[in-house]
């Protein structure tokens, strides 16, 4: 029988300069308030203002950015957390589960995990991710790392190519190639808060954004017991020691997830489904009337008291009652959002409570809103309509293709930095400018100080005498480039690409 005690999970210590001694309820809450301040005031949150949700480079302020989306997710996460705590209180289980003095931190961790959940996303969202991964795959050919004979290996980076008689180094080469070809926004988020920005958040707060538990260098299929939790890469080779320590501090078994992350995930699922449809109406991709008919058609036949009738039809009818004095669009989405939240939030909260033993252990291998219920079907309805009528719209597809080209082009522009021999690049890092490398010097100067320092620190910890040194140095050099380009906003990436391609007016 699993003993559920959240005092063992809500760890308020930090990696550096951690508070010591036994803390009162108020003192622990203050520690998490410090986390809130660090997160809300971070540049990574501010950059979300100019990162896309669905429509890249959008000038209409009514259409969501990653920041406005994240604020909405934060509110839904708070709602779910409060609902869970309220239900546990009604059952006199708060003290039993060690939450009687941790309700404030519980809510705060969920809220800030929601606010941070997208900070690692590159410009142009999933198409930015795809561009980064495709560019590196075309050079590193990670699938060839299993090839026999070794001469079949097509990797164009000589020091990462497999070599006869070097099995230990070959295993590292395989890991590095796989890792670099699996850039992922969630894994980059972990790298941002720990390695790049050194936010020194509490262990519990970082645990809240470790959405997937698969390392980026993983090869083959994940175990069936964790196939959902390991659906995508959750962290990179560069953060492996930190994640190992995180698991220890949060009492997490290998490939297990922190309990409050399920709440963040549910809040994101609820928020973006309605928001994407509302943004599509704002962009005139379809009208409210057309959206209603799309939803009606996709759901199919239903009875009067069905969930569809209670949520979608109810919103439609109410919006028309007030249509004389208010915008039908605004009214419809207000009621649709309220109705959706009032149904899905209690369901998510109850699913959390019903599966608390597995969730506490970190092994619940599903999303909270992934079941055979009508609530899950409603969420799928929103997603399917958006997929069919929004994401496949010519304007959206054109912008995504442009975004893909921009990110691919920027990587190609900065490729000379990856082509430099180790000794020359080390000299460039030290002196910042070399006359014999005018192009590389100018490109290096453009990299942000934060990213350069992260590279210098990582390489400085390596033993230069080790045979692994050239491989790992190149790995961190590639990370430097991925960090810089993924940290750009959509607009900055677009402008930088135009400037460097000499297409600016």
From Swiss-Prot:
The keyword Hydrolase applies. InterPro entries: dGTP_triP_hydro_central_sf, dGTPase, dGTPase-like, dNTPase_1, HD/PDEase_dom, HD_domain. Its cofactor is Mg(2+). One of its GO terms (biological process) is dGTP catabolic process. SMART domains: HDc. SUPFAM superfamilies: HD-domain/PDEase-like. Residues 66-273 form the HD domain. GO terms for molecular function: dGTPase activity; magnesium ion binding. The keyword Magnesium applies. It catalyses: dGTP + H2O = 2'-deoxyguanosine + triphosphate + H(+). Keywords: Hydrolase, Magnesium. Coiled coil: none annotated. Its EC number is 3.1.5.1. dGTPase preferentially hydrolyzes dGTP over the other canonical NTPs. Homotetramer. Belongs to the dGTPase family. Type 1 subfamily. This is Deoxyguanosinetriphosphate triphosphohydrolase. It comes from Escherichia fergusonii (strain ATCC 35469 / DSM 13698 / CCUG 18766 / IAM 14443 / JCM 21226 / LMG 7866 / NBRC 102419 / NCTC 12128 / CDC 0568-73).
């Amino acid at each position: 029988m699993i003993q559920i005690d959240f005092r063992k999970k809500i760890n308020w210590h930090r990696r550096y300069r951690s508070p010591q001694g036994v803390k009162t309820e108020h003192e622990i809450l203050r520690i998490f308030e410090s986390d809130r301040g660090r997160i809300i005031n971070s540049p990574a949150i501010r950059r979300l203002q100019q990162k896309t949700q669905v429509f890249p480079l959008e000038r209409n302020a009514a259409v969501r950015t990653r920041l406005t989306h994240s604020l909405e997710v934060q509110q839904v996460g708070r709602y779910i957390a409060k609902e869970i705590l309220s239900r546990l209180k009604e059952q006199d289980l708060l003290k039993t589960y060690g939450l009687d003095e941790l309700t404030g931190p519980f809510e705060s961790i969920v809220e800030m995990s929601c606010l941070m959940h997208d900070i690692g996303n590159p410009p142009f969202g999933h198409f930015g991710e795809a561009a980064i991964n495709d560019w590196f795959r075309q050079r590193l050919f990670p699938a060839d790392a299993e090839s026999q004979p070794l001469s079949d290996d097509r990797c164009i980076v000589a020091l990462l190519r497999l070599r006869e008689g070097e099995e230990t180094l070959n295993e590292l080469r395989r890991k590095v190639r796989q890792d670099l070809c699996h850039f992922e926004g969630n894994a980059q988020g972990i790298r941002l808060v720990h390695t790049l920005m050194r936010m020194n958040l509490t262990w519990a707060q970082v645990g809240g954004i470790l959405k997937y538990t698969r390392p980026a260098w993983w090869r083959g299929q994940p175990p069936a017991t964790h196939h959902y939790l390991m659906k995508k890469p959750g962290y990179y080779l560069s953060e492996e020691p930190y994640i190992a320590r995180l698991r220890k501090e949060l009492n997490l078994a290998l490939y297990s997830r922190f309990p409050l992350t399920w709440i963040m995930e549910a809040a994101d699922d609820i928020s973006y489904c309605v928001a994407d449809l509302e943004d599509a109406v704002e962009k005139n991709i379809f009208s409210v009337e057309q959206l209603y008919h799309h939803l009606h058609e996709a759901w199919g036949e239903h009875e009067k008291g069905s969930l569809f009738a209670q949520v979608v039809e109810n919103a439609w009818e109410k919006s028309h009652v007030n249509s004389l004095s208010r915008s039908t669009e605004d009214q419809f989405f207000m009621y649709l959002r309220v109705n959706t939240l009032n149904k899905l939030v209690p369901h998510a909260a109850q699913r959390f409570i019903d599966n608390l033993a597995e969730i506490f252990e970190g092994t619940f291998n599903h999303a909270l809103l992934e079941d055979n219920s009508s609530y899950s079907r409603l969420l799928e309805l929103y997603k399917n309509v958006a997929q069919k009528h929004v994401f496949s719209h010519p304007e959206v597809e054109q912008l995504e293709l442009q975004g893909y080209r921009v990110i691919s082009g920027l990587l190609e522009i900065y490729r000379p930095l990856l082509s430099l021999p180790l000794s020359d690049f080390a000299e460039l890092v030290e002196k910042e400018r070399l006359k014999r490398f005018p192009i590389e010097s100018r490109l290096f100067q453009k990299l942000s100080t934060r990213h350069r320092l992260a590279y210098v620190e990582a390489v400085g910890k390596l033993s230069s005498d080790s045979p692994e040194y050239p491989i790992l140095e190149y790995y961190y050099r590639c990370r430097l480039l991925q960090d810089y380009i993924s940290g750009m906003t959509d607009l900055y990436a677009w402008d930088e690409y135009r400037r460097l391609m000499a297409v600016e007016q």
